[in-house]
């Protein structure tokens, strides 16, 4: 009897498959992506490697030494203090505690602050509160800290917003009116996002994470691209990550263009050049998980799409890998076996420059991804590599080479806790455990500025406030 391997369905349910069936599923998944995206399927060697990853005997797997990548985040501290019946675990804690827990306890390379609603529009009335929270976090933290939110253009339609719902208008065959409503909503989305980030950047934010971009279709993508363009023009040093909502941009409008390209129907490898053109530093491509398909099918399909996006993108690609995307099951407590296998496959086969950790409980998301493929932040040199990706648009190989040269170490040493612990203390760039008298917060980041030859926004704010 053929050996069967314990894998997952797209909803997280356990399923047992023989190697022959696993290969059939991988071939079908990569063929589906190749057909839809008109891109190359995985090679025979890549499919065999993916099968080997899926069939590894351990519950958790990880990338090979030296292949670690930085991680970014979606939903910020909500996975800790959130309690809405989704993936939040309802721990009563401040956002400062949540951010520092990711930095000091989870080994995150970057982190983000976000509003409990996690959309830009609701931030407007409480932006002063968000600015104060950002300042306090920046004074205490060392890793890059973004402000994260969803463009969420749907909030601009009735009953939540001022413009009539285009879905209702279309049902009434008022097509032009529906188009007008989407265009007006996109303009307001752009305006609000710029205004909010002007305030947050003035309060020391390293940058912005546009999460779930294009959730409301091509109008949402259109408004976000124009917001990125305006922010880049006003703030050349701002870190900007653009993470998508789905694998294909839905044509809710159908006629909107950016840089002469129609936005409706774009796949990840077609979205990447537009995100770069707008002025982002990092692109977060997405591939949806099909809950009725197996993990070999879903992961092969996701890796195929993302591999092509990485290939054509001039920007570093941090693939979005929360529950329900990136080959990961759609489950609030994502299975560790599935998460770590998807994480390893994206790094070793798709060649991603980083991973955007999405929705899921703390153990199933940040802890699993960081254990599988992360650089472990301040435990090693993950925060430094991430800063070079966002400061200079460096892909993973270039960023690692740059940081290794500055530290006078081998590339493989960048994720070595033993080597980096002593080196970080010697250079006074912040250590993960408490050392009396060592640089912390702004002081450590000022030393990182000198080491890497970059500017850090919270340090610029400190100098402005002190006149030094």
Swiss-Prot record:
It catalyses: Co(I)-[dimethylamine-specific corrinoid protein] + dimethylamine + H(+) = methyl-Co(III)-[dimethylamine-specific corrinoid protein] + methylamine. Its EC number is 2.1.1.249. Keywords: Methanogenesis, Methyltransferase, Pyrrolysine, Transferase. Pathway: One-carbon metabolism; methanogenesis from dimethylamine. It holds the Pfam family Dimeth_Pyl. It is an enzyme of class 2 (transferase). The keyword Magnesium does not apply. The keyword Transcription regulation does not apply. GO terms for molecular function: dimethylamine methyltransferase activity. One of its GO terms (biological process) is methylation. It comes from the Archaea. Belongs to the dimethylamine methyltransferase family. Catalyzes the transfer of a methyl group from dimethylamine to the corrinoid cofactor of MtbC. This is Dimethylamine methyltransferase MtbB1.
């Amino acid at each position: 009897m053929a050996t069967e391997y314990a894998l997952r369905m797209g909803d997280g349910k356990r399923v047992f498959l023989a190697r022959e069936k696993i290969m059939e599923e991988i071939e079908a998944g990569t063929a589906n992506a190749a057909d839809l995206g008109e891109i190359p399927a995985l090679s025979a060697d890549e499919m065999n490697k993916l099968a080997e990853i899926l069939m590894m005997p351990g519950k958790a797997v990880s990338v090979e030494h030296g292949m670690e990548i930085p991680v970014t985040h979606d939903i910020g501290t909500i996975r800790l203090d959130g309690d809405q019946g989704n993936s939040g675990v309802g721990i009563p804690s401040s956002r400062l505690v949540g951010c520092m827990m990711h930095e000091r306890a989870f080994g995150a390379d970057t982190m983000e602050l976000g509003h409990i609603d996690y959309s830009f529009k609701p931030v407007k009335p409480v932006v002063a509160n968000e600015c104060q929270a950002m300042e306090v976090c920046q004074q205490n933290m060392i890793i890059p800290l973004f402000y994260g939110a969803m463009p969420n253009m749907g909030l601009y339609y009735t009953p939540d917003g001022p413009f009539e719902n285009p879905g209702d208008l279309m049902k009434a065959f008022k097509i032009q009116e529906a188009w007008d409503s989407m265009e007006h909503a996109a303009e307001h989305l752009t305006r609000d996002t710029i205004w909010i980030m002007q305030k947050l950047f003035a309060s020391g934010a390293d940058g912005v994470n546009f999460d779930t971009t294009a959730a409301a279709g091509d109008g949402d993508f259109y408004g976000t691209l124009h917001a990125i363009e305006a922010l880049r023009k006003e703030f050349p040093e701002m870190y900007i990550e653009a993470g998508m909502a789905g694998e294909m941009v839905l044509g809710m409008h159908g006629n909107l263009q950016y840089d002469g390209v129609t936005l409706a129907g774009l796949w990840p490898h077609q979205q990447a050049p537009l995100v770069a053109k707008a002025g982002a530093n990092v692109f977060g491509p997405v591939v949806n998980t099909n809950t009725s398909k197996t993990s070999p099918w879903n992961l092969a399909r996701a890796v195929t799409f993302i591999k092509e996006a990485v290939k054509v993108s001039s920007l570093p690609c941090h693939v979005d890998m929360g529950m329900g995307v990136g080959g990961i099951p759609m489950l609030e407590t994502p299975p560790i076996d599935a998460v770590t296998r998807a994480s390893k496959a994206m790094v070793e086969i798709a060649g991603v420059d980083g991973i955007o950790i999405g929705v899921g409980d703390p153990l199933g998301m940040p802890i699993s991804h960081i254990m599988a493929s992360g650089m472990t932040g301040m435990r090693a040199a993950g925060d430094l590599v991430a800063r070079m990706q966002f400061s200079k648009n460096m892909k993973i190989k270039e960023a690692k080479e740059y940081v290794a040269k500055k530290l006078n170490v081998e590339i493989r040493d960048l994720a070595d806790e033993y080597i980096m612990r002593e080196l970080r203390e010697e250079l006074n760039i912040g250590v993960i455990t408490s050392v009396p008298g060592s640089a912390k917060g702004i002081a450590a980041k000022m030393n990182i500025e000198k080491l890497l030859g970059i500017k850090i926004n919270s340090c610029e704010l400190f100098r402005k406030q002190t006149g030094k």
